[in-house]
Amino acid sequence: EAFSNAGKYGMIEAMKQRELLDFLHALECLKTNGRHSVTCGGVTESVAAHSWRLSVMALLLLPEFPEIDGDKLIRMCLIHDFGEAITGDIPSFLKTDANEATETDAIGSLTGTLPEPQRGMLRALFAEMDAMQTKEARLYKALDKMEAVIQHNESDISTWIPLEYELNLTYAAENAAEFPYLKELRTMMAEDTRQKIAKAKEEQA
């Protein structure tokens, strides 16, 4: 029932097959568009890979948050980086207000190619995510940032840039603080970061 294609989102009409294919083609580059992180195998992480594992995180954590709309949360996680199909990924520590505006325009362009009710459903989700007024939006944002830190903890430390030694200890902490489970998880992640840094220093000594 949580993943029904009807109900509150009104998705009771099928997209025309060509509309579906065209939209999927527009998103295909997310499979190869790189992010700032490098995986444990030495491969540049893709935007799609980040969104996939973020969605898995959200799915696994649903029992911890019975008060939230889990369907909406997972939808947010799945779509949140659609704009990067046009803009590419920009690391958080480099992203400007102008970059944010460009990504918003990109989302508008992409969703504008969809028919209703799909267009309206996606645009409503993006508006809710941007407003950060609902618990679902704030939880998605916390998980989004935390997944990035988890990936950095998994990457070879030689791929880190200098500012990340501090950033990986603090990034997402403010977002996680609202949710006791995530606050504890973020503390555990920071300890993993400290241990990773300490191990690297020992190996260099």
Residue ranges and their predicted role:
Residues F3-A205:
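Alpha-helical, largely C-terminal catalytic domains
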